[in-house]
Swiss-Prot record:
Protein name in the entry: Bradykinin-potentiating and C-type natriuretic peptides isoform 2
Keywords: Cytoplasm, Hypotensive agent, Metalloenzyme inhibitor, Metalloprotease inhibitor, Protease inhibitor, Pyrrolidone carboxylic acid, Secreted, Signal, Toxin, Vasoactive
Organism: Bothrops jararacussu (Jararacussu)
Phenotype for residue 71 to A: Low decrease in ability to enhance AsS activity
Expression sites (tissue/organ): Expressed by venom gland.
Amino acid sequence: MVLSRLAASGLLLLALLALSVDGKPVQQWAQSWPGPNIPQLLVQQWAQGGWPRPGPEIPPLTVQQWAQNWPHPQIPPLTVQQWAQGRPPGPPIPPLTVQQWAQARPPHPPIPPAPLQKWAPVQKWAPVQKWAPVQKWAPLLQPT
């Protein structure tokens, strides 16, 4: 969705940059095209009124012809619409049993509360290891 809008705005920006304010192309060589002469499209010729247009004649849509005069018999309204304003066809539906006992007592015994959690006993940690005292070494011999 965002990409399509971004692409559309980019194409619009390119189209606006290609035309100047007066509607003529910005490029100077647009009046004298340096390439070969390209004839106008046939679609543009007959779209401006050059009838008959090329190709076989396309008849008007049949949907447009019979949309005003529907060829099929009249479709009756839905039965849902008929009984939605009054009583529905068929026997009445009793209320749900859940609604019946939800206002009174439930049909089963109450659920007992969960037992309290018993915590594990506190573990005593091992005593902290005491390090051996720092050993004193003999002084280093000095060269004489």
